[in-house]
Design a protein with these regions (language model features):
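Active-site phosphate/ATP/adenylate-binding loop shared across adenylate-forming ligases
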Residues: 4-6, 63-231, 237, 245, ...
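AMP-binding/adenylate-forming catalytic core of the ANL superfamily
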Residues: 184, 292-403, 423
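Conserved AMP-binding/adenylate-forming
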Residues: 211, 215, 220-314
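Short, well-ordered beta-strand segments
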Residues: 133-135, 287, 377
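Helix N-cap/coil-helix junction residues
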Residues: 35, 45, 59, 126, ...
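Extracytoplasmic/secreted proteins and extracellular or luminal domains
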Residues: 177, 203-206, 279, 300, ...
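Nucleotide 5′-phosphate-binding alpha/beta core
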Residues: 1-92, 98-115, 122-123, 178, ...
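Generic structural signal for residues in well-ordered beta-strands
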Residues: 158, 236, 267, 361-363, ...
């Protein structure tokens, strides 16, 4: 096995050995951070392969980190980089609170994480020598630049196009028609938007060069997958990761779910109420401990906010069959993800109800012109300026959630009548197909 984690696919026996050593190293790393002072003193490092001993480690929630001011987060949770392993990047957390978290990533973190991103291409079926059109948003969230660099590292030609803000969508269609890439990678909603735009311009992508579409960063429903397959005339594969850990998994087209890189991450599925470890195949809360991308951010038993199943020994073809299969069910709390941004329902309500001009509202995640859209319907307080109120809602949602909503006004009383017809007011709803 290679000295660098993730460079090769290990055997099942090697993965077990990686877990034994990696869990000890992860706890030792965490104990260096002031945040964990006094939280891990009762842990017996010689018994971490015993699930009961490992379960004594307290679960880590994002709210614990969000509660810290920036200076405290970097001082108490993050570890100082070593002389030979300086900070290489900062990754923005996928969640939003008005004060997003920015995780430092060291050079060694990035080297290992790059293998996780590169595996997506190999697992999904991309081959060296092919060309990839990379259409993820470009910025401090890592997926766009990391998937592009991973394509290059995998022997694939890469076009870093972005998701419409850096390279206009119309130009991207021209480039796809002209350069004839084999693979498109991007968020599913943007891939559909490109397909619709191509159709409007008389370009038949279904009979074009792209034969593989790789998605990530937002939910991929069965209906959306089928529409992508039909419009692009391509196989569609999804992938799964999180900023706290890195790219963690991808579909191989055989198993029903993601092959998850269990040599880079130690995964648990627990009962979200009792915290008890669940048997394989049962739905529970995903808990992640990065084993090698923790040189500055020592995430330990991280509650990701996802409900999943995890099955081991799932038959498959090729080297990735050694990995367990993770199937994503839903978020454990009130979230939905739009264009890679997690919208927390409670935080959204707090924001809306702080605006004096707004009487009531409902928020819906919808699909419009193949793009995921945040539609916000508002009832405006009498005597308030409707145009100014709409502008305020747009501005505040953009400021806090970094997402531009589609705001519509309703006659006062409309929502009350809707809510009265339901036992539980459907104020925030995901209506995407």
């Amino acid at each position: 096995m290679s000295a660098q984690p993730g460079a090769t696919i290990p055997s099942a026996a090697e993965i077990a050995a990686i877990h034994s050593a990696g869990k000890i190293a992860a706890v030792r790393q965490a104990k260096r951070a002031p945040f964990f002072r006094g939280r891990l003193d009762h842990i017996d490092l010689t018994r971490l392969d015993d699930p009961a001993e490992w379960a004594k480690i307290p679960l880590l929630h994002k709210d614990m980190l969000r509660a810290m001011p920036d200076a405290e987060f970097y001082r108490n949770f993050c570890l100082p980089p070593s002389e030979d392993d300086r900070i290489a990047q900062y990754w923005r957390s996928g969640g939003t609170t008005g004060r997003p978290l920015f995780y430092p990533r060291s050079r060694r973190d990035i080297e290992v994480a790059m293998h996780g991103f590169a595996r997506v291409y190999a697992c999904a079926g991309a081959k060296p020598g092919q060309t990839v059109h990379c259409a993820y948003p470009l910025g401090i969230h890592p997926v766009g630049q990391m998937m592009t660099r991973a394509a290059e590292a995998s022997g694939l030609g890469a076009l870093m196009a972005g998701a419409g803000t850096t390279t206009p969508s119309s130009l991207q269609i021209e480039l796809i028609d002209k350069l004839k890439p084999d693979v498109l990678t991007g968020m599913s909603s943007y891939a559909l938007h490109l397909a619709n735009l191509a159709d409007q311009n008389g370009i038949d992508l279904a009979h074009g060069s792209v034969d593989l579409v790789i998605c990530s960063a937002e939910p991929l429903s069965a209906a959306k997958r089928e529409k992508l397959r039909r419009m692009w005339g391509a196989e569609v594969r999804d992938s799964f990761g999180m900023t706290e850990a890195g790219m963690m998994a991808a579909e191989d087209g055989v198993a029903d779910g993601f092959r998850v890189w269990s040599d880079l991450f130690f995964l648990e599925v627990i009962d979200p109420t009792t915290g008890q470890l669940l048997p394989g195949g049962e739905t529970g809360a995903l808990v992640v401990t990065p084993l090698f991308t923790n040189n500055i951010t020592p995430f330990l038993r991280w509650m990701s906010g996802d409900l999943v199943t995890l099955r081991r020994d799932v038959p498959g073809a090729g080297p990735f069959a050694v990995f367990p299969v993770l199937r994503h069910a839903q978020r454990t709390t009130g979230f939905f993800k739009i264009r890679g941004i997690n919208i927390n329902h409670g935080e959204f309500e707090d924001l809306m109800f702080r605006m004096a001009q707004i009487n009531d509202f409902k928020c819906e995640a919808v699909t419009a012109d193949a793009l995921d859209v945040l539609r916000v319907c508002v009832e405006i307080k009498r005597n308030a300026d409707p145009a100014a109120a709409v502008a305020l809602v747009e501005r505040e949602i953009k400021r806090v959630f970094e997402l531009t909503p589609r705001v519509e006004t309703l006659e006062v009383g409309t929502l009350a009548r809707e809510f009265e017809a339901s036992v539980k007011a459907p104020r925030i709803v995901d209506r995407r197909a």
